UniProtKB/Swiss-Prot annotation:
It catalyses: adenosine(2503) in 23S rRNA + 2 reduced [2Fe-2S]-[ferredoxin] + 2 S-adenosyl-L-methionine = 2-methyladenosine(2503) in 23S rRNA + 5'-deoxyadenosine + L-methionine + 2 oxidized [2Fe-2S]-[ferredoxin] + S-adenosyl-L-homocysteine; adenosine(37) in tRNA + 2 reduced [2Fe-2S]-[ferredoxin] + 2 S-adenosyl-L-methionine = 2-methyladenosine(37) in tRNA + 5'-deoxyadenosine + L-methionine + 2 oxidized [2Fe-2S]-[ferredoxin] + S-adenosyl-L-homocysteine. The lineage of its organism: Bacteria, Pseudomonadati, Pseudomonadota, Alphaproteobacteria, Hyphomicrobiales. S-adenosyl-L-methionine binds at G210, E211, S242, S264, L265, H266, N341. Pfam families: Radical_SAM, RlmN_N. The active site is at E126, C384. It is found in: Cytoplasm. This is Dual-specificity RNA methyltransferase RlmN. Specifically methylates position 2 of adenine 2503 in 23S rRNA and position 2 of adenine 37 in tRNAs. m2A2503 modification seems to play a crucial role in the proofreading step occurring at the peptidyl transferase center and thus would serve to optimize ribosomal fidelity. Belongs to the radical SAM superfamily. RlmN family. Its EC number is 2.1.1.192. Residues 132-373 form the Radical SAM core domain. InterPro entries: Aldolase_TIM (IPR013785), Methyltransferase_A (IPR040072), RlmN_N (IPR048641), RNA_MTrfase_RlmN (IPR027492), rRNA_lsu_MTrfase_RlmN/Cfr (IPR004383), rSAM (IPR007197). Disulfide bonds join C139-C384. Reaction proceeds by a ping-pong mechanism involving intermediate methylation of a conserved cysteine residue.
Length: 408
């Protein structure tokens, strides 16, 4: 497979003029990411009569999340004078799209640049769209960088800069829907690989940069807005939050957000998991499995997904497969087997495909679904474990090294 680094101009993604007025909009309160109650309070604060606030919130919510507008002028059932008032006080601008890459398999990756907060600098994060037959999955980031330093993950080599806000998490979804033509009256880019019918984005996974449960409140707020039936209206059964095992946040996720849960597992004993996923030293497997068994709503209809990266001669033996079955005993679960995706400087190799299939057979025979995830977007560093905002600026030597390890 040849490696493509197509940092093409953003011609494939419709960016309206209003989306680029970022500096001017920075000092204004963004309505994106506010709850309806917070939006009502913001309207009262600028002098909107209290008797009007519920109606105005409904109007704004519809235009922002159903129609997907990013310019108050497009809100056709709001008077021009009221539009001007909103423009003066609020922002609904999108972040800057600093880069877009399109894989040969149709996977798309956007590099989004957010303005500085306080005395900080602008930050960049990556968001990935994975089209499949009948569905389209958007992988969202929750932090800029990560603190967890999982040894097989590229994001773990980028130090944590800061948490993303609810606005910035939601902005990833809004930008992706803009670019894919997933709002009413928008056109899908020519040649784009998307579901033939219905929505272009059917599923959300919090599996991008960062640990979602270390940014719980912002993630919660963003996902509750994304699943609101009067707006973006994504089913909670189609939203999956993935954690490396932040045990205290897991029960809260089920109780307060109610989405599907995925566990970044990758090992069946504490010694190995301490090395692969260092947070295991704080929340070892016994605590993690106990929290899984207590997850609210857990049932055969609401299973936990366990993610297991396949590392050659590290965690891929048939004995490991048998121990995995024992570890998950009694937990309604699905096990995603993930072929390791190489990145510059990684010290691991992907398990041989035949070994992955043998591993899957052991798990399947024990009654667990264990699909092997087909790598998507490897050629643009968009596959699982490959996200890192600095990857858009890889040095030539790193690109050549990546091409060598992908093709070997």
């Amino acid at each position: 497979m040849a490696v493509s680094y197509d940092l093409r101009p953003i011609g494939t993604c419709p960016v309206r003029e209003s989306d680029n007025i970022i500096v001017k909009e920075r000092s204004k309160l963004s309505l994106i990411g506010l709850s309806q109650d917070e939006m009502a309070e913001a309207l009262k604060a600028i002098g909107i009569p209290e008797r009007q606030t519920r109606m105005r919130v409904r109007q704004l919510w519809h235009w922002l999340y159903v129609r997907g507008v990013s310019n108050f002028d497009e809100m056709l059932n709001i008077s021009k004078p009221m539009q001007e008032i909103f423009k003066k006080h609020f922002s609904i601008a999108r972040p800057e799209i600093a880069g877009e890459q399109i894989s040969k398999d149709g996977t798309r990756k956007w590099l989004l640049r957010f303005p500085p907060r306080g005395a900080g600098r602008p930050v960049e994060i990556e968001t990935v769209y994975i089209p499949e037959e009948g569905r389209g999955t958007l992988c969202l980031s929750s932090q800029v960088g990560c603190t967890l330093t999982c040894s097989f993950c590229y994001t773990g080599t980028q130090v944590l800069v800061r948490n993303l806000t609810a606005e910035e998490i939601l902005a990833q979804l809004l930008v992706a829907r803009d670019c894919l033509g997933d709002f009413p009256d928008r056109n899908t880019p020519d040649g784009a690989i998307v579901p033939v019918e219905g929505r272009k984005i059917t599923n959300i996974v919090m599996m991008g940069m960062g640990e979602p449960l270390y940014n719980f409140e912002a993630v919660k707020k963003a996902l509750l807005i994304a699943s609101d039936g009067n707006g973006l209206s994504l089913s909670k059964r189609r939203i999956t939050l993935s954690t490396s095992g932040v045990v205290p946040g897991m029960i809260r996720t089920g109780e307060e957000i109610g989405v599907m849960l995925a566990i970044s597992l990758h090992a069946v004993n504490d010694t190995l998991r301490d090395m692969l996923v260092p947070i295991n030293k704080k929340y070892p497997l016994a605590l993690l499995m106990d929290a899984c068994r207590q997850y609210p709503g857990l049932s055969n209809a609401k299973r936990i997904t366990f993610e297991y990266v396949m590392l050659k001669d590290v965690n891929d033996s048939l004995d490991d497969a048998k121990r995995l079955v024992q570890l998950l005993k009694g937990i309604p679960a699905k096990i995603n087997l993930i072929p390791f995706n190489p990145w510059p400087g990684s010290n691991y190799q992907c398990s041989d495909w035949e070994q992955i299939e043998r591993f899957a057979d052991v798990v399947n025979q024990a009654g667990y679904a264990s699909p092997i995830r087909i790598p998507r977007g490897r050629d643009i560093l968009a596959a699982c474990g490959q996200l890192k905002s600095a990857s858009e600026r890889l040095r030539k030597s790193e690109r050549l090294h990546l091409e060598h390890i992908v093709n070997s």
